[in-house]
Regions:
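Short internal beta-strands
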Residues: 35-41, 195-199
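Donor-nucleotide binding loops and adjacent catalytic segments primarily
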Residues: 153, 159-231
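Acidic donor-binding loop of glycosyltransferase active sites
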Residues: 230-241
Length: 302
Protein backbone atom coordinates (compact mmCIF):
# COMPACT_ATOMS: atom_id res chain seq x y z
CA UNK A 1 0.00 0.00 0.00
CA UNK A 2 1.13 3.55 -0.69
CA UNK A 3 2.46 5.26 2.45
CA UNK A 4 1.11 8.55 3.79
CA UNK A 5 3.00 10.36 6.56
CA UNK A 6 0.92 12.91 8.45
CA UNK A 7 2.77 15.68 10.32
CA UNK A 8 0.87 17.88 12.79
CA UNK A 9 1.15 19.01 16.41
CA UNK A 10 -1.09 20.25 19.20
CA UNK A 11 -0.35 22.35 22.27
CA UNK A 12 -1.74 25.02 24.55
CA UNK A 13 -0.09 27.60 22.29
CA UNK A 14 -1.24 26.47 18.84
CA UNK A 15 -4.40 24.64 19.90
CA UNK A 16 -5.63 21.25 18.73
CA UNK A 17 -7.16 22.16 15.37
CA UNK A 18 -4.18 21.13 13.21
CA UNK A 19 -3.91 17.78 14.95
CA UNK A 20 -7.63 17.00 14.91
CA UNK A 21 -8.30 17.78 11.26
CA UNK A 22 -5.16 16.01 10.02
CA UNK A 23 -6.04 12.94 12.05
CA UNK A 24 -9.54 13.15 10.53
CA UNK A 25 -7.93 12.97 7.09
CA UNK A 26 -5.87 9.96 8.18
CA UNK A 27 -9.06 8.28 9.38
CA UNK A 28 -10.65 8.83 5.96
CA UNK A 29 -7.67 7.29 4.15
CA UNK A 30 -6.48 4.54 6.50
CA UNK A 31 -8.29 1.71 4.68
CA UNK A 32 -6.65 2.53 1.36
CA UNK A 33 -3.20 3.72 2.46
CA UNK A 34 -0.50 2.78 4.95
CA UNK A 35 -0.87 5.78 7.29
CA UNK A 36 1.55 6.93 9.99
CA UNK A 37 1.14 10.03 12.16
CA UNK A 38 4.15 12.06 13.32
CA UNK A 39 3.82 14.54 16.20
CA UNK A 40 5.78 16.17 19.02
CA UNK A 41 5.14 15.55 22.74
CA UNK A 42 1.62 14.05 22.37
CA UNK A 43 -0.70 14.26 25.36
CA UNK A 44 -2.57 11.22 26.63
CA UNK A 45 -5.62 12.50 24.74
CA UNK A 46 -3.67 12.68 21.48
CA UNK A 47 -2.25 9.20 22.01
CA UNK A 48 -5.70 7.73 22.61
CA UNK A 49 -7.05 9.43 19.46
CA UNK A 50 -4.13 8.34 17.26
CA UNK A 51 -4.36 4.75 18.49
CA UNK A 52 -7.92 4.62 17.11
CA UNK A 53 -6.70 5.57 13.63
CA UNK A 54 -3.14 4.55 12.77
CA UNK A 55 0.40 3.99 14.09
CA UNK A 56 2.23 7.09 15.29
CA UNK A 57 5.78 8.30 15.85
CA UNK A 58 6.75 10.77 18.58
CA UNK A 59 9.27 13.40 17.48
CA UNK A 60 11.65 15.33 19.71
CA UNK A 61 10.60 18.97 19.65
CA UNK A 62 14.13 20.37 19.49
CA UNK A 63 14.97 18.30 16.39
CA UNK A 64 11.61 17.54 14.80
CA UNK A 65 12.39 19.14 11.41
CA UNK A 66 15.46 17.01 10.71
CA UNK A 67 14.06 13.94 12.43
CA UNK A 68 10.99 13.89 10.20
CA UNK A 69 13.03 14.53 7.05
CA UNK A 70 15.35 11.64 7.90
CA UNK A 71 12.37 9.28 8.10
CA UNK A 72 11.44 9.93 4.46
CA UNK A 73 12.51 7.45 1.79
CA UNK A 74 11.02 9.39 -1.12
CA UNK A 75 8.10 7.11 -1.95
CA UNK A 76 5.69 8.61 0.59
CA UNK A 77 2.88 11.13 0.36
CA UNK A 78 3.49 13.74 3.07
CA UNK A 79 0.73 15.82 4.67
CA UNK A 80 1.91 18.92 6.58
CA UNK A 81 -0.40 20.95 8.80
CA UNK A 82 1.08 23.88 10.71
CA UNK A 83 2.08 27.48 10.10
CA UNK A 84 5.79 26.96 10.80
CA UNK A 85 6.44 24.73 7.78
CA UNK A 86 8.22 27.15 5.46
CA UNK A 87 8.64 27.05 1.69
CA UNK A 88 12.21 25.80 2.19
CA UNK A 89 10.95 22.92 4.33
CA UNK A 90 8.34 22.05 1.72
CA UNK A 91 11.10 22.08 -0.90
CA UNK A 92 13.30 19.77 1.21
CA UNK A 93 10.46 17.24 1.34
CA UNK A 94 9.86 17.50 -2.40
CA UNK A 95 13.58 17.02 -3.07
CA UNK A 96 13.34 13.68 -1.29
CA UNK A 97 10.96 12.61 -4.05
CA UNK A 98 7.79 12.72 -1.96
CA UNK A 99 4.40 14.02 -3.05
CA UNK A 100 3.36 16.85 -0.72
CA UNK A 101 0.02 18.07 0.61
CA UNK A 102 -0.19 21.23 2.74
CA UNK A 103 -3.23 21.85 4.95
CA UNK A 104 -3.28 25.53 5.86
CA UNK A 105 -5.58 28.33 7.03
CA UNK A 106 -3.22 30.98 5.72
CA UNK A 107 -1.87 32.09 2.34
CA UNK A 108 1.25 33.84 3.59
CA UNK A 109 3.96 31.86 1.81
CA UNK A 110 4.89 30.35 -1.53
CA UNK A 111 3.75 26.75 -1.85
CA UNK A 112 5.70 24.13 -3.75
CA UNK A 113 3.26 21.44 -2.58
CA UNK A 114 1.36 19.28 -5.05
CA UNK A 115 -1.90 20.03 -3.22
CA UNK A 116 -2.96 22.82 -0.85
CA UNK A 117 -6.14 22.36 1.21
CA UNK A 118 -7.67 25.49 2.74
CA UNK A 119 -11.31 25.31 3.83
CA UNK A 120 -11.40 28.97 4.85
CA UNK A 121 -10.65 30.52 1.45
CA UNK A 122 -12.38 30.36 -1.91
CA UNK A 123 -10.26 32.75 -4.01
CA UNK A 124 -7.36 31.05 -5.85
CA UNK A 125 -5.79 34.42 -6.66
CA UNK A 126 -4.75 34.78 -3.01
CA UNK A 127 -2.29 31.88 -3.26
CA UNK A 128 1.31 31.94 -4.50
CA UNK A 129 1.85 28.44 -5.89
CA UNK A 130 3.70 26.42 -8.50
CA UNK A 131 2.09 25.75 -11.89
CA UNK A 132 1.40 22.13 -10.88
CA UNK A 133 -0.15 22.88 -7.46
CA UNK A 134 -3.79 21.94 -7.07
CA UNK A 135 -5.84 24.18 -4.77
CA UNK A 136 -8.65 22.57 -2.79
CA UNK A 137 -10.55 25.53 -1.35
CA UNK A 138 -13.75 26.11 0.59
CA UNK A 139 -16.12 24.11 2.77
CA UNK A 140 -16.24 21.18 0.34
CA UNK A 141 -12.70 20.39 1.49
CA UNK A 142 -13.30 20.70 5.24
CA UNK A 143 -11.57 17.84 7.07
CA UNK A 144 -14.32 16.62 9.36
CA UNK A 145 -14.18 13.69 11.73
CA UNK A 146 -16.51 10.78 10.98
CA UNK A 147 -19.30 11.63 13.49
CA UNK A 148 -19.58 15.12 11.99
CA UNK A 149 -19.68 13.76 8.44
CA UNK A 150 -22.51 11.49 9.52
CA UNK A 151 -24.31 14.35 11.28
CA UNK A 152 -24.07 16.48 8.13
CA UNK A 153 -25.97 13.80 6.19
CA UNK A 154 -28.92 13.94 8.56
CA UNK A 155 -31.59 16.61 8.29
CA UNK A 156 -31.59 18.77 11.40
CA UNK A 157 -34.36 20.94 12.78
CA UNK A 158 -33.11 24.18 14.28
CA UNK A 159 -35.12 25.43 17.23
CA UNK A 160 -36.06 29.10 17.50
CA UNK A 161 -36.07 28.89 21.28
CA UNK A 162 -32.59 28.80 22.79
CA UNK A 163 -32.59 26.48 25.79
CA UNK A 164 -29.43 24.39 25.38
CA UNK A 165 -26.11 26.13 24.70
CA UNK A 166 -22.61 24.76 24.12
CA UNK A 167 -19.53 26.96 24.56
CA UNK A 168 -16.22 25.82 23.06
CA UNK A 169 -13.09 27.94 22.58
CA UNK A 170 -10.40 25.31 22.22
CA UNK A 171 -8.42 23.05 24.46
CA UNK A 172 -6.35 25.76 26.14
CA UNK A 173 -8.34 29.03 25.94
CA UNK A 174 -5.58 31.03 27.63
CA UNK A 175 -7.68 34.20 27.43
CA UNK A 176 -10.66 32.57 29.21
CA UNK A 177 -13.08 33.54 26.47
CA UNK A 178 -15.14 30.61 27.73
CA UNK A 179 -15.71 32.33 31.08
CA UNK A 180 -16.80 35.57 29.42
CA UNK A 181 -19.42 33.92 27.23
CA UNK A 182 -20.67 31.60 29.96
CA UNK A 183 -21.58 34.73 31.91
CA UNK A 184 -23.21 36.20 28.80
CA UNK A 185 -25.29 33.06 28.22
CA UNK A 186 -26.50 33.04 31.82
CA UNK A 187 -28.29 36.31 31.02
CA UNK A 188 -30.48 34.58 28.42
CA UNK A 189 -33.67 33.86 30.32
CA UNK A 190 -34.69 30.92 28.12
CA UNK A 191 -31.47 28.95 28.71
CA UNK A 192 -31.74 25.93 31.00
CA UNK A 193 -28.54 24.07 30.05
CA UNK A 194 -25.00 25.31 29.33
CA UNK A 195 -22.14 22.95 28.48
CA UNK A 196 -18.66 24.50 28.45
CA UNK A 197 -16.16 22.28 26.65
CA UNK A 198 -12.63 22.90 27.93
CA UNK A 199 -9.24 21.22 27.82
CA UNK A 200 -6.94 20.03 30.58
CA UNK A 201 -4.90 23.24 30.27
CA UNK A 202 -7.91 25.51 30.80
CA UNK A 203 -7.55 27.89 33.74
CA UNK A 204 -10.38 30.36 34.43
CA UNK A 205 -9.27 33.95 35.07
CA UNK A 206 -11.72 34.18 37.95
CA UNK A 207 -13.51 31.59 40.06
CA UNK A 208 -15.77 29.33 38.03
CA UNK A 209 -19.41 30.34 37.94
CA UNK A 210 -21.59 28.25 40.20
CA UNK A 211 -24.94 27.71 38.52
CA UNK A 212 -27.10 24.61 38.31
CA UNK A 213 -27.52 25.14 34.57
CA UNK A 214 -23.77 25.01 33.88
CA UNK A 215 -21.51 22.00 33.46
CA UNK A 216 -17.86 21.86 32.34
CA UNK A 217 -16.75 18.90 30.21
CA UNK A 218 -13.35 17.89 28.85
CA UNK A 219 -11.70 15.11 26.86
CA UNK A 220 -14.80 14.58 24.75
CA UNK A 221 -14.59 12.11 21.90
CA UNK A 222 -15.60 13.19 18.41
CA UNK A 223 -18.88 11.34 18.84
CA UNK A 224 -19.58 13.08 22.14
CA UNK A 225 -18.84 16.47 20.56
CA UNK A 226 -21.12 15.73 17.62
CA UNK A 227 -23.90 14.57 19.94
CA UNK A 228 -23.51 17.74 22.02
CA UNK A 229 -23.66 20.04 19.00
CA UNK A 230 -26.64 18.19 17.51
CA UNK A 231 -28.46 18.55 20.82
CA UNK A 232 -27.65 22.27 21.24
CA UNK A 233 -29.86 25.16 20.19
CA UNK A 234 -26.81 27.43 20.04
CA UNK A 235 -23.06 26.76 19.82
CA UNK A 236 -20.69 29.59 20.76
CA UNK A 237 -17.16 29.07 19.45
CA UNK A 238 -14.22 30.50 17.52
CA UNK A 239 -14.10 30.82 13.73
CA UNK A 240 -12.11 27.60 13.42
CA UNK A 241 -12.51 23.89 12.78
CA UNK A 242 -14.90 23.68 15.73
CA UNK A 243 -17.19 26.14 13.95
CA UNK A 244 -17.30 23.93 10.86
CA UNK A 245 -18.09 20.91 13.03
CA UNK A 246 -20.96 22.76 14.72
CA UNK A 247 -22.37 23.93 11.38
CA UNK A 248 -22.14 20.37 10.05
CA UNK A 249 -24.37 19.30 12.94
CA UNK A 250 -27.00 21.84 11.89
CA UNK A 251 -26.54 23.97 15.00
CA UNK A 252 -27.16 27.69 15.17
CA UNK A 253 -23.66 29.12 15.66
CA UNK A 254 -22.39 32.35 17.21
CA UNK A 255 -18.69 32.71 16.47
CA UNK A 256 -15.86 35.20 16.74
CA UNK A 257 -12.12 35.38 16.17
CA UNK A 258 -9.20 35.93 18.54
CA UNK A 259 -6.09 35.21 16.45
CA UNK A 260 -5.21 36.69 13.07
CA UNK A 261 -5.47 33.44 11.14
CA UNK A 262 -9.17 33.20 12.07
CA UNK A 263 -10.11 36.66 10.81
CA UNK A 264 -10.43 35.89 7.10
CA UNK A 265 -12.41 32.73 7.79
CA UNK A 266 -14.66 34.73 10.12
CA UNK A 267 -15.28 37.25 7.33
CA UNK A 268 -16.19 34.40 4.96
CA UNK A 269 -18.68 33.00 7.49
CA UNK A 270 -20.25 36.42 8.00
CA UNK A 271 -20.48 37.23 4.29
CA UNK A 272 -22.39 33.99 3.69
CA UNK A 273 -24.70 34.50 6.67
CA UNK A 274 -23.66 31.22 8.27
CA UNK A 275 -23.05 32.52 11.80
CA UNK A 276 -24.08 35.13 14.34
CA UNK A 277 -21.02 37.39 14.36
CA UNK A 278 -19.27 38.09 17.66
CA UNK A 279 -16.29 39.99 16.25
CA UNK A 280 -12.95 39.96 18.07
CA UNK A 281 -13.77 37.94 21.18
CA UNK A 282 -10.51 38.92 22.91
CA UNK A 283 -11.88 42.46 22.94
CA UNK A 284 -15.61 41.71 23.03
CA UNK A 285 -17.86 44.50 21.82
CA UNK A 286 -20.93 42.51 20.76
CA UNK A 287 -23.68 41.90 23.28
CA UNK A 288 -24.60 38.23 22.89
CA UNK A 289 -28.21 38.70 24.01
CA UNK A 290 -28.77 41.50 21.51
CA UNK A 291 -27.03 39.62 18.69
CA UNK A 292 -29.11 36.49 19.24
CA UNK A 293 -32.35 38.49 19.53
CA UNK A 294 -31.57 40.48 16.36
CA UNK A 295 -30.80 37.33 14.38
CA UNK A 296 -34.04 35.76 15.63
CA UNK A 297 -36.06 38.77 14.45
CA UNK A 298 -34.32 38.83 11.06
CA UNK A 299 -35.05 35.14 10.57
CA UNK A 300 -38.78 35.75 11.07
CA UNK A 301 -38.81 38.74 8.71
CA UNK A 302 -37.40 36.74 5.79
Amino acid sequence: MKKIYFRADASATIGYGHFIRTLALADMLKDDFDCTFFTCHPTSYQVSEMEKVCPFVTLQEEAHYDEFLSSLQGDEIVVLDNYFFTTDYQRAIKQKGCRLVCVDDMHDKHYVADVVINHGQTNPALFDVEFYTRLCLGFDWALLRKPFLEAAKRKSISSDRIEKVAVCFGGSDIHDITGYFVNQVLRLCTVNSITAVVGDAYTPHSSCVQDSRLVYRSRLTAQEMADLFCDSDLVICSASSVCIEALACGAKVAAGWYVDNQKEFYDLLISNGWIIGLGNVRQPSVDLCNAVSYTHLRAHET
